[in-house]
Amino acid sequence: MDPAMQAPLRIAMVAGEASGDMLAALLIGGLQADWPGIELCGIGGPEMARRGFTPWWPSERLAVHGYSMQMLRRLRELLGIRRQLRRRLLAHRPALFIGIDAPDFNLGLEADLRAAGVKTVHFVCPSIWAWRAHRVGQIRRSADHVLCIFPFEPALLAQHGIAATYVGHPLAALIALQPDRAAARAQLGLRADDEVLAILPGSRASEIEYLARPFFQAAALLRQTRPALKLLVPAVLPLRERIVQAAQAAGMGEQVQIIAGQSHTVLAACDATLIASGTATLEAALFKRPMVIAYRMHPLNWSLMRRQQLQPWVGLPNILCREFVVPELLQDAATPQALCAATQHWLDARRQHPPTITALERRFTALHHSLQRNTPQLAADALRTILAH
């Protein structure tokens, strides 16, 4: 029997941020089904730990990325963690290393491990189709294989000599094709005829800093003509106080309902959402909800991103649909007045022109079907093939 197929199999993983923790947890489920007694270690979050993963460092230590000022300030710490992790992995070599997203941290580590003979897999293709196309060379050096969550990515990577497998998007399996709005509203204490706006200003402190206040200012403008509009804000505990402060600064402290977590319940219950660009926009699309996508950042970050942007869209629903199916308001365009007007369009359409909403829901349902696969099993199948060679 191939030694790599014998238990206990040892696999090292690195996941950054909550989204990486969720993706890795699904992957662990598939691995454990195929290899009982598998040993899993590295950098991970609470969902991974609940499934038997041994975290040497918590994933929140990596929770900065891109060209952010936070990353520049913390570069020494991140490089130190990566050096320690590399030494540990080379001293106690795993059968396989899997980097989950976090390309700024993982690709360099993967390259070093691969050069030393450790098989490497990168889960979630870096968005070379959106910006930073030069990164494709780094992916080719770093990963023996890439597990892709969007259907067009394997063919793109194949053009550059990179082996890849489409495993579907885990969120598409997690979210029902027909979300139960009535159940979600009942859970949140809402009436069937309530008009509900979900406000999601981001999952990182930097996003809250730039987006929360204009989002709440837009909500205040909406309430001037829609005084009964319900405003729901799902918030993870570490960001709750920042969100409360932003709401108070906009004079909306008593008018918004801040809910601990439950972003999926809020998206299922709402009529529309005002939302920060990121994975949450795909979640909103999978819940078939009209949205206004917005983003603001430090001017230096904005300048760097615009210089390397390859597509006219920023929001994932628009990128995947290849057109502006929902509006995007970015940087200086994301004013309270513009956010209010774009959101009002969707709220008015739901009550005054339902076919507009129906057409959007059909588009998002087709997108949902294209992303829905048995991700844990497909990923485990790909890893089995990699380990056997």
Swiss-Prot record:
Cross-referenced SUPFAM superfamilies: UDP-Glycosyltransferase/glycogen phosphorylase
Catalytic activity: a lipid X + a UDP-2-N,3-O-bis[(3R)-3-hydroxyacyl]-alpha-D-glucosamine = a lipid A disaccharide + UDP + H(+)
Entry keyword annotation includes Transferase: yes
Keywords from the UniProt entry: Glycosyltransferase, Lipid A biosynthesis, Lipid biosynthesis, Lipid metabolism, Transferase
Protein name in the entry: Lipid-A-disaccharide synthase
PANTHER family from the UniProt entry: LIPID-A-DISACCHARIDE SYNTHASE, LIPID-A-DISACCHARIDE SYNTHASE, MITOCHONDRIAL-RELATED
Family named by the database record: Belongs to the LpxB family.
Function per UniProt: Condensation of UDP-2,3-diacylglucosamine and 2,3-diacylglucosamine-1-phosphate to form lipid A disaccharide, a precursor of lipid A, a phosphorylated glycolipid that anchors the lipopolysaccharide to the outer membrane of the cell.
Pathway assignment: Bacterial outer membrane biogenesis; LPS lipid A biosynthesis
Enzyme Commission (EC) number: 2.4.1.182
Family annotation (Pfam families): LpxB
InterPro entries: Glyco_trans_19
GO MF annotation, one: phospholipid binding
Keyword Transferase: yes
BP-aspect Gene Ontology terms: lipid A biosynthetic process
Enzyme class, UniProt record, top EC level: transferase
One Gene Ontology cellular component annotation held by this UniProt entry: membrane
Bilayer-spanning residue ranges: none
Natural source organism: Verminephrobacter eiseniae (strain EF01-2)
Domain of life: Bacteria
